[in-house]
From Swiss-Prot:
GO terms for cellular component: outer membrane-bounded periplasmic space. Gene3D superfamilies: PEBP-like (3.90.280.10). The gene is ybcL. Homodimer. This is UPF0098 protein YbcL.
Amino acid sequence: MKTLIVSTVLAFITFSAQAAAFQVTSNEIKTGEQLTTSHVFSGFGCEGGNTSPSLTWSGVPEGTKSFAVTVYDPDAPTGSGWWHWTVVNIPATVTYLPVDAGRRDGTKLPTGAVQGRNDFGYAGFGGACPPKGDKPHHYQFKVWALKTEKIPVDSNSSGALVGYMLNANKIATAEITPVYEIK
C-alpha cells in the first residue's frame, strides 16, 4: 500500500511538472513542417507574404518579468546564421502575438514592445528565404521568458546584440522549428 501511495504521488508530481512546462504554439506553423508562402520573404528572389505567424505561449516560469520573440535560421550560409525577427520588452501579462505582429509599423505589437533590426536590414519580421536548391533550413521561432522588464535595445539593434542581451537575462525558452526550402 505504501508503494502504491508513493508511486501515485510521484506520478502526480511528474504530471504537474510536465503540465507547467513553458511552451509555445501556433495555428500557422509546426515543428518539422514546411512553412507556407505567407511566411516567406518578399524580395531577395523569394515571393511570399512576409507575414509573421501567430504565437501563443503558456506555462510561464515563475519570476518572468517580460518576454521576447526571435526567429533565427542557423542554416543560412553566412557563417553566422540569419536573424529574421527580434522583438523584446513584451509585457509579462501578454502571452499571445497575432498574425502579422511583425509588420514594420509595429501596430500589432503590445505597447512598449520593440522590434530590432533583422538581417534584411529593417526592424520587423523578414520571412524565410533560403538559397534556391539549398538543403531545408530550420527556422527557430523562440519565445524567451526574461528576468528583466526591459532589454536596453532599439529598432536599430542587430540580432546578435539582441541575442546576447536575451541570453544574459533568460529564465527559459520555448521553441517551434518549422522548415523551408526552395527546390
